[in-house]
Amino acid sequence: MKFLLSTLAATICFATATSAFASGADPLVTIQKKWAVCQYESKDTDNQIYCLENLIKRNEEALKQEPNRQELKVWLAINKSSLAGADGGLGALSLVKEAKVLLEQVIDKAPETLNGSAFTSLGSLYYKVPGWPIGFGDDEMAEKMLRKALEINPDGIDPNYFYADFLAQDGRKKEAIQYLTKAQKAPPRADRPLADQGRKQEIAKLLGELQ
């Protein structure tokens, strides 16, 4: 049960990201909001790649300024994984390996960062990346990470959605529907309305395929 790396695709609008960083806004908030723009309002793959490459650079710059800020590490991992999905090609596996290292560092130092988002992100990599000998994909590790994410954030939209997606790909339809239904009822994130809207569309799509 391995997905092509293209399923990890996401994008960002670099022009607006640049102005947001320049304005003195919290880089974490900017990254989160612009990621939602990339993921759900992207116009084409080339734009995804260009914008995400530049966002990664700015994420790295922000992390240099605050090297102990684990939230920025989580999002750097998410952005690298997203670029791997958007670009594919020979560099994709290197990007997801870099993302894996970042997420493992967060889990080791501050596992509850962003409500356990490192577990959710690492779990999704484990079931989407090809397994040995190509990559590090591992369904058992995927389920372990995703269930840990749910222990930390049992009502969150993302951990419930990604665990449901994993279950669906594993052929566990009934369980997947249960977690998708729970994801639909997740409390809204006041600072991330676009991300919530886009995720709910993905939830509805997967539910439609399973029912």
Per-range role (PLM):
Residues D44-E60, A92-V101, G135-E143, Y179:
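Helix-turn-helix repeat elements of alpha-solenoid scaffolds
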Residues S6-T16:
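Bacterial N-terminal signal peptides
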Residues P67, P111-T113, P154:
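Short coil turns that delineate tetratricopeptide repeat
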Residues K57-K64, I107-D108, R147-E151, K185:
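Conserved structural position within tetratricopeptide repeats
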